[in-house]
Amino acid sequence: ISIDSSGEGLYGNFFNIGLGGSKQDGKIAPERNITTQWDGPWIGETAVTDGGWSAEMFIPWSALSMPEGSQERRIAIAMFRKVAYLDERYSFPPLPFSQARFISAFEPVRIDKVNPRQQWEVYPYVSATSDEIRNEADGRGGIDVAWRPSTNLQLTATVNPDFGSIESDDVVVNLTAYETFYPEKRLFFLEGNEVFVTSPRSNPRGPSGPGGSGGRQSVQTYRMEPTTLLNTRRIGGSAKHVEIPDYLTVSGVEQSKPTELVGAVKAVGQSGGLRYGLLTAFEKEVEWRGVWNNTDREMTLKSDGRDFGVVRLLYESAGGGGRQSIGYMGTLASNPLNDAVV
């Protein structure tokens, strides 16, 4: 099932469940721009009956981004069923892949008295690490906070975040001249990230990217992509701005280490047809272990971390049987050597 919670074909979510209980969810941007990194709080169960099968889903309204409304609210839905052994796909309303319209063609539905309450979410953590080779131990703690004062505004913040539990990336064999963009898997950056994506208004088949089965994937035939101004994987990534003195040797392993964050703040919301987003993040001081070339004595090379800032404004209108949109995005990446403003 797919739900256009805006009611105007501006944004939505999809929820899939298989007969064996497997689940998948994600977000939808106009028209058929689908991302699967989002992980929503919902429940689904299936069962085989004497006459066939059944499926039930419980999707809380608070999991969806919804514009501020009155007692009666307009949304749109679409339902899909895939019969694997026949390789057939059914949908209501009919939404063939050859059709440019997708989310704006969902079936309108009116609902009453749906106005999710404001929400608080707090995730503290404590972790410890031990390095037996260097005979070192380290402990740390931090907190993630999310606040949704209304259905059309969400504020999230993280202090000393712990991204060590994030699953690793798949191995991608890229023999092209184009950079591989790995998907974002950190929850803080996933929530509301669709606002920061500059996407085409009509995308019948979906974007290109790594394909194939198993852990080793190959890059498919290159197709023109939207302008990418924000790649959040570079926030907290390996430091590229550190200058290494000639008398010092730093291993490639040290240089490829991710940089820890001091904290980050993000605000995402909407007012009518205007959607907006603000993201800022601050990295900790970079510390690399190096070796003096002449003495083989170890030393620590230090450098200030980077600061990041992003502002996004997007106005969309689906009135008059057409779609109009105009947007702005500004980015800042600041480090001790230079500042990049786009």
Q: Model regions: which residues?
A:
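Cysteine-dependent hydrolase recognition
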Residues: G330
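Structural preference for beta-rich elements and adjacent junctions enriched in aromatics
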Residues: I1-S317, G327, L337-D339
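Long, ordered, helix-rich scaffold segments
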Residues: G322-I326
